[in-house]
């Protein structure tokens, strides 16, 4: 089985046959949320991920295209590559396990979030301690920015879990065929 990384341009100019190639690229360019699309020969999906270095800024975009014997990641923002690097055992999986590999990568994205969320929890505790003593004058603005950042993260986690559930459901259907 082949796992590869491409840029959007490399994917578009690839000589290989990829059903729904143009729809995939259009979905990537207009990414509004995390989603996955299934078709008879495979599936593709888009991940719109909040940038933890700047939660108020632009989203990071990654995508995957899966067909029998092949997974292609479009990952110019370098979101998927580190997850796959940590899971080197996934590179030796046989053909027919494409969706299992994809699920492992998506679950890896969630696992990598746990330490980050623990740091946020610590910051919240620090803020609570400060607020008990003396609330700062700009507290409403700070709270609003923080709430917006948490809303972005929450939206991503909900969408990612929806994508994972959809893939698991589709995997179950394919196994029962």
Regions from the PLM with identified roles:
Residues 1-93, 123, 159-175:
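Helix-boundary and N-terminal cytosolic regulatory elements
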Residues 75, 93-97, 116-119, 156:
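A generic short alpha-helical patch detector that favors 3-5-residue windows
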Residues 93-109, 113, 175-177:
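Long, non-coiled-coil amphipathic alpha-helical linker/lever segments
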Residues 106-120, 124-127, 143-146, 150-153, ...:
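Amphipathic alpha-helical coiled-coil segments
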Residues 108, 112, 134, 170:
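Residue-level signal for short amphipathic helical patches enriched in basic/charged
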Residues 129, 133-139:
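Long, hydrophobic alpha-helical segments that serve as membrane-spanning/inserting helices
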Residues 137-177:
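Membrane-associated alpha-helical segments
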């Amino acid at each position: 089985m082949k796992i590869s990384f491409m840029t959007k341009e490399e994917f578009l100019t690839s000589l290989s046959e990829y059903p729904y190639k143009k729809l995939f690229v259009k979905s990537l360019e207009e990414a509004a949320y995390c989603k996955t699309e299934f078709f008879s020969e495979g599936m593709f999906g888009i991940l719109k991920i909040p940038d933890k270095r700047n939660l108020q800024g632009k989203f990071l975009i990654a995508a995957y295209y899966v067909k029998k014997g092949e997974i292609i990641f479009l990952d110019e923002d370098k979101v998927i590559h580190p997850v796959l690097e940590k899971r080197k055992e996934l590179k030796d999986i046989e053909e027919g396990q494409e969706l299992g590999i994809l699920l492992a990568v998506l679950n890896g994205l969630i696992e990598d979030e746990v330490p980050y969320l623990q740091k946020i929890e610590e910051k919240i505790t620090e803020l609570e301690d400060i607020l008990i003593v003396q609330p700062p004058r700009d507290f409403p603005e700070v709270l609003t920015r923080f709430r917006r950042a948490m809303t972005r993260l929450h939206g991503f986690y909900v969408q990612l879990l929806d994508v994972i559930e959809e893939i698991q459901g589709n995997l179950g259907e394919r196994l029962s065929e």
